[in-house]
Amino acid sequence: IGAATEDTHEGMATLEKTADDLRASEFVPFKAGMDAGAHLVMVGHVSAPNLTGDNTPCSLSAEVITNLLRGELGYNGIVITDAMDMSAITEYYDSGEAAVMALKAGADMILMPEDFEAAYEGVLTAVRDGVISEEQINESLRRIYRVKYRDRIDQDGNVVDNISGQQAPVEGEGQEGTAGEGQEGTVAEG
């Protein structure tokens, strides 16, 4: 976000603007992108205490991801964190803790945790213990699959080669799955 003067690669960055000021300035291009059909929004590690009520990075904040992006702005696409190996995260959280916090906050994807195995184990344990529900993971997967397949299905429900735009050959029967929200047909998965 433009008003942050610090670099989250190097440490914590804080926005001191009020929530109303952020809505009137920094959020305008994000809202325009969402309205234009952006498939993915990356949430950075900047802290916005006047928006969230504390110094939690936006990428780990349910106030930002769930309440603002998904609730107030009505965004239902993929939310991905900025790289989790940045100092704004690694100086304050271990990889497992940060990954769990991001998913609990509403992120669908965790980008580049400092320690992938620790992040994976943290999430796995959180799901096993009921800290993160399987339904939440499944909803994130639905968002990801919807985007993944959206650009691969033509209006007739045929799988299309992403590079040429031509119908892709499908060998064998494969497995059938739904094409995606608002589209009819099946896709071959393999």
Model-inferred region functions:
Residues 1-136, 143:
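Second-shell residues forming the walls of enzyme active-site clefts
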Residues 132-138, 153-159:
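Flexible, glycine/charged-enriched surface loops at secondary-structure junctions
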Residues 142-156:
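Structural signature of the thiamine diphosphate
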Residues 158-190:
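Ser/Thr/Gly/Pro-rich low-complexity, disordered linker/stalk segments of secreted
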